[in-house]
């Protein structure tokens, strides 16, 4: 079935944020992964390097992002492009939550500050 209903999504928690997975190999996608992230107010993101290009579309709130040391704020309707290999961090410095839709390709992984590789379950 080409429709993945919200009730069929998989919810994951990490670093205080909620990742709701919709498209991934586990859900029948062969090339793309897509999820919604919700970051509570006052949450500082964990900087990490990404193995694949990542696109974030901000749905609500203000997302503070850092890409290879360049910092900026993205609000509803804005898009953040994160190149493969970039050092990336996303934070929410406001009081309310921020939500974004994230898309990348299958095989996405991150390198955490301690040097360990992490393949997120919402992208597998």
Regions found by a protein language model. Give the residues of each.
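Short beta-strand His + acidic residue motifs that chelate non-heme Fe in jelly-roll/DSBH
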Residues: 46-47, 65-66, 82, 88-95, ...
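A short, compositionally biased micro-patch
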Residues: 40, 50-51, 58, 83, ...
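Short acidic-glycine-tyrosine-enriched beta hairpin
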Residues: 69-85
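A short hydrophobic beta-strand segment most commonly corresponding to one strand
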Residues: 34-36, 81, 95-111
């Amino acid at each position: 079935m080409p429709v993945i209903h919200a009730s069929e999504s998989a919810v994951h928690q990490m670093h205080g944020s909620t990742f709701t997975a919709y498209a991934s190999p586990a859900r029948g996608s062969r090339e793309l992964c897509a999820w919604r992230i919700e970051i509570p107010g006052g949450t500082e993101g964990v900087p990490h390097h990404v193995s694949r290009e990542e696109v974030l579309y901000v749905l609500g709130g203000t997302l503070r992002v850092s890409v290879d040391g360049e910092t900026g704020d993205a609000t509803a309707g804005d898009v953040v492009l994160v190149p493969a290999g970039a050092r990336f961090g996303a934070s929410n410095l406001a009081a309310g939550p921020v939500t974004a839709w994230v898309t990348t390709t299958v095989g996405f992984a991150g390198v955490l500050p301690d040097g360990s590789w992490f393949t997120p379950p919402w992208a597998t």
